[in-house]
Amino acid sequence: MDFGLATTLYPDEYNYQTDAYSPTSSPVDLVQVIQQLHASLDPRTVFACYGKVLGQHLPIQGVRLQSEQHKLSWGKRYGISLKRQIICGGTPLTLQYQLLTPLTPSQSICLQEIEPLLLQPLLNAMQYQEMSMQAMFDALTGLGNRHYYSQSLKNAVARAQRKQGSVSLIVLDLDNFKKLNDKYGHKCGDYILKEFGDIIRSSIRSTDQAFRIGGDEFVVIVQGNIHAAGLLCERIVSATNTHASFHQFGVSCSLGAAEASETMEAEQLYEQADKTLYQAKASGRNCYKLSPTQLS
């Protein structure tokens, strides 16, 4: 599910084909290892490179890394287990190796030489990933932000123009949100925004994308036609109406949806969905409207 929030930016497991370990492998070129590990800012690629180096020089056929925020895996998950703790940027990490055979004293020394080389490139990659996430996602709701939305909508509309599937856009707005903020304060308002983000997140499908683009305005890019967008609107309105806090504070939502045509640009699709949203508000709010020109 891509809300632009993600969840994780990278998959937990990343397998990388390695050269088979040979007891006659040449000595480790530590300078070359450093260069290889610094070649990427993708944590999974850095970790896969680390695993490949280990597999070439030591009887290691798999390694996993785990911290509070990261899980990375390379190679096989069976063998003789060896667990080690390292500190990366002040964060404790657990490395669990899967060995073909127990390490000899010289092999243990080799591992101790290679292991510290992982820390700085992995820390760089993790920090870059975190900055990328912050640049793409709304801090309050965890949904995509305006910048991520703009790029995603252009890409989605381009696919529709190439006849690679239907794309619709839903524009959502909270009813009575300003009154809530004025009466109960911004802390309460932030709580409602976060809860609404959770409602959207739990309502959309894995192929849809949700964003908060400002204030109490949200959008959803739907991979489907106007009827698919309508079903999603129904789920969101129903979930909002049955949410205790929304009922308590007198907040509801209005939605408008439109489907992209082969000749429509991204901004035109937004304008059509936004126009339909205001038709929903004019109809009494707490409802949704679909672009009438696209219903058949």
Swiss-Prot record:
Disruption phenotype: Deletion of the gene does not affect the growth of MR-1 in batch cultures, but it leads to a strong reduction of c-di-GMP production. It also results in impaired biofilm formation and decreased current generation during growth on electrode surfaces.
Keyword GTP-binding carried by entry: yes
Superkingdom of the organism of origin: Bacteria
Catalytic reaction annotation: 2 GTP = 3',3'-c-di-GMP + 2 diphosphate
Keyword field contains Transferase: yes
Gene Ontology MF, one: GTP binding
GO BP term, pick one: negative regulation of bacterial-type flagellum-dependent cell motility
Function: Catalyzes the synthesis of cyclic-di-GMP (c-di-GMP) via the condensation of 2 GTP molecules. May be involved in the regulation of formation of solid surface-associated biofilms and pellicles according to environmental conditions.
Name used for this protein in its record: Diguanylate cyclase DgcS
